[in-house]
């Protein structure tokens, strides 16, 4: 409750000005579940302009949705006016938002009952839709009719399955049936928004459960590059998923589990940045090499420590070893390398040209690569004179 106490002064100030105010959303849910608390959000009957008048330190980030960020005790908090939403456009966003003075009207528009619990600054729960009971049963249940909620915003179906993965809850039967019926509406949602939810699913503690629900509800058939992948997804559930340190590792493990042969093509369908695609593919390539042999100096040098660490963690998950010492061994081997990259070589292409009468050409790059590998393998000291003598001894100059 300590973090809520820090934010309670906002609620107290709003109430002093004649407004209602409550803690709402995921932070209240996580408090009940006894999970780490994320962002703390506040809902109030005060209109955005009234909130800004009360709190001089504010940022008007989403006034059209009623949201003002209030900075209190050095922390930012989203303060949002109670609101209802009109008909939704394209199954993803309301055509308009109406501010109201009723907490119940605000809570009834939310996605799942576990997320529709409010809490006073004293810690008293306002549970109008049996959210606490759903949490006790570990069930994900929509507020009101599931068909209505998913037709309003189709992304809620992905959120529901994401919560299966992150919380270890199960889908309430009518909620699950509605996902099976309305899964096709997910095709109206921007891929980027789906990717965010799927990534949270992959990094969840109960990821296997989430993947199983993707299959059972057939929602996978509306996801990029997974339309015909029921067997591949079921194969992925046979692996023991670990809590990876990075999302790159989670995606690499997933692609390995489903046997994806064209990872770059797959990831482009999910609208990833070129850098992230490059990292994930690099991890997969390193895993392929790692399966063939232990790390050696050349493989580790060419891979680089950042990719190598991720690849080793994923490899340990694949073989179900989970040996943390293996990553430390990779780190020790890398730190023992004479050089960590080509920029640390004490010779340049210009040096090579000055030592010979040859004209510039491809031979310069080839020679630098030979020198680089010799240094990395410990066959050559990284000193300019030693390098020149080595080249002369090998008749390479």
UniProtKB/Swiss-Prot annotation:
It comes from the Bacteria. ATP binds at residues 26, 29, 110, 153, 156, 159, 162. It catalyses: a tRNA precursor + 2 CTP + ATP = a tRNA with a 3' CCA end + 3 diphosphate; a tRNA with a 3' CCA end + 2 CTP + ATP = a tRNA with a 3' CCACCA end + 3 diphosphate. One of its GO terms (biological process) is RNA repair. Mg(2+) binds at residues 39, 41. Gene3D superfamilies: 1.10.110.30, 1.10.246.80, 1.20.58.560, Beta Polymerase, domain 2. Transmembrane segments: none annotated. Its EC number is 2.7.7.72. GO terms for molecular function: ATP binding; CCA tRNA nucleotidyltransferase activity; magnesium ion binding; tRNA binding. Keywords: ATP-binding, Magnesium, Metal-binding, Nucleotide-binding, Nucleotidyltransferase, RNA repair, RNA-binding, Transferase, tRNA processing. It holds the Pfam family PolyA_pol. CTP binds at residues 26, 29, 110, 153, 156, 159, 162. The keyword ATP-binding applies. Its cofactor is Mg(2+). CDD domains: NT_ClassII-CCAase. PANTHER family: CCA TRNA NUCLEOTIDYLTRANSFERASE 1, MITOCHONDRIAL. Catalyzes the addition and repair of the essential 3'-terminal CCA sequence in tRNAs without using a nucleic acid template. Adds these three nucleotides in the order of C, C, and A to the tRNA nucleotide-73, using CTP and ATP as substrates and producing inorganic pyrophosphate. tRNA 3'-terminal CCA addition is required both for tRNA processing and repair. Also involved in tRNA surveillance by mediating tandem CCA addition to generate a CCACCA at the 3' terminus of unstable tRNAs. While stable tRNAs receive only 3'-terminal CCA, unstable tRNAs are marked with CCACCA and rapidly degraded. A single active site specifically recognizes both ATP and CTP and is responsible for their addition. Belongs to the tRNA nucleotidyltransferase/poly(A) polymerase family. Bacterial CCA-adding enzyme type 3 subfamily. Homodimer. NCBIfam families: PRK13299.1. This is CCA-adding enzyme. The gene is cca.
